[in-house]
């Protein structure tokens, strides 16, 4: 997917990129490749692949569930790595307030430089483990939306993310083709943490056989205070 086809696909979904937005994605790609020589951010470096498997893939929740992102919403991206999915979404939705939580300082240095290069405002970087962020009173139950992409299986991701969502907020999980199996495994965790599965959308990336699944979990009640458990526990002993 070259940049022109990327723009066409977005236009087909009702998102016409301005010249500024096209330039922001081009800058994003160049910065990613440049920084990737120093810090391992991605194994995908071919331009067409980055536009498809990072940029377009990150934007799929916005294309499928655009109403969730309307207005001046707050979004917390857990374990964003190189900024996926939150920063491609931010480029298309400038009114969004983004908070990125990541545990690796080198990745945050990249993100800090990238945000500056893209001239993005209302983006906050938090150097923290997800479990610690969920117990931080400045972050816990503060966000309209929480996203996670390629972070952990659904039962673990739920414990990382649901505590950060406001009641009536949403977790949007970007998963691969085996998400239904993960959902069965995560049923108890989602319920215990105060969530309810609202929607599961299966899709294929354009002109490929690459299957993706988007899972939307609505937070219907407050998360019990003991969750998330201390760092490392959710992964070792999933709910």
Swiss-Prot record:
Biological role stated in the UniProt entry: Specifically methylates the N7 position of a guanine in 16S rRNA.
Compartments reported by the entry: Cytoplasm
Signal peptide: none
Alphabetized UniProt keyword annotations: Cytoplasm, Methyltransferase, rRNA processing, S-adenosyl-L-methionine, Transferase
Superkingdom field: Bacteria
Family under the similarity heading: Belongs to the methyltransferase superfamily. RNA methyltransferase RsmG family.
Binding site for S-adenosyl-L-methionine: 79, 84, 130-131, 149
Catalytic activity, EC: 2.1.1.-
SUPFAM superfamilies, per the entry: S-adenosyl-L-methionine-dependent methyltransferases
Name of the protein this chain belongs to: Ribosomal RNA small subunit methyltransferase G
Root EC class: transferase
């Amino acid at each position: 997917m070259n940049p022109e086809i990327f723009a066409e696909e977005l236009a087909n979904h009702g998102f016409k990129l301005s010249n500024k937005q096209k330039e922001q994605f081009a800058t994003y790609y160049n910065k990613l490749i440049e920084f990737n020589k120093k810090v391992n951010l991605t194994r995908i470096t071919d331009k067409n692949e980055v536009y498809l498997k990072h940029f377009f893939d990150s934007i799929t929740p916005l294309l499928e569930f655009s109403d969730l992102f309307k207005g001046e919403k707050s979004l917390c991206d857990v374990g964003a790595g190189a900024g996926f999915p939150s920063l491609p979404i931010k480029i298309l939705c400038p009114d969004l307030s983004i908070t990125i939580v990541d545990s690796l300082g080198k990745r945050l240095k990249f993100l800090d430089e990238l945000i500056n290069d893209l001239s993005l405002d209302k983006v906050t970087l938090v150097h923290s483990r997800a479990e610690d962020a969920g117990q931080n009173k400045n972050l816990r139950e503060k966000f309209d939306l929480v996203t996670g992409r390629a972070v952990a299986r659904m039962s673990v991701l739920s414990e990382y993310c649901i505590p950060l969502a406001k009641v009536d907020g949403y977790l949007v999980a970007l998963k691969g083709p085996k998400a239904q199996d993960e959902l069965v495994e995560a049923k108890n965790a989602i319920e215990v943490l105060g969530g309810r599965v609202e929607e599961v959308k299966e899709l294929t990336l354009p002109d490929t056989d690459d299957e993706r699944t988007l899972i939307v979990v609505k937070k219907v009640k407050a998360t019990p205070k003991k969750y998330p458990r201390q760092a490392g526990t959710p992964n070792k002993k999933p709910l």
